[in-house]
Amino acid sequence: MKRTPVHPVNPHIRNSFVSDFYLNLKRSGRGRLILRMLEHVLGTEINGSLPQRLHLPHPYGILTGSTGKIGEDVTLMHFCLLGPKDPWYQGDSWDNLFPTLEEGVYVSSGAKILGPLTIGAWSVIGANAVVTEDVPPFSTVFGHNRILRTTEGGDPRVRRYLDSRQKAQ
């Protein structure tokens, strides 16, 4: 798995090997039986398209919708949910029912992101937060839709990383 300075490899966390194995199985499409057994053991079901750089430090209990979009450098902690908002949906299409996570979003453990909304780039979703509204870039969300907006452009490490990417292009 490709790593960035935002998510360096930590040799002391063995779960990253499990998550890398899971993501490689998911991307390759091979080993369906092993993939299903691993999903059953981990309690994780990640559907839809996967980015090249998705970070799952603790790959347990993660559920994502089939049409949700996940950007590069996103971190999903354990027991987070990216799902539809309306449990009694009777419409014709499931195309726009799941959230979109832009680049660099960090979703803490137990967070629920519900509905067809967009989480802005490099935002942080706090533990056990429930998000049902759009979140602007470089914001922090906690509780139930408590959004703290920042105008400084986020963490200095993230700014340095983004600046170095722009210089490389």
Regions found by a protein language model. Give the residues of each.
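Terminal amphipathic alpha-helical/low-complexity segments used for targeting or macromolecular assembly
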Residues: M1-G43, R146-Q169
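Left-handed beta-helix
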Residues: L42, Q52-R53, P57-Y60, G65-S66, ...
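C-terminal catalytic lobe of FAD-dependent flavoproteins
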Residues: I46
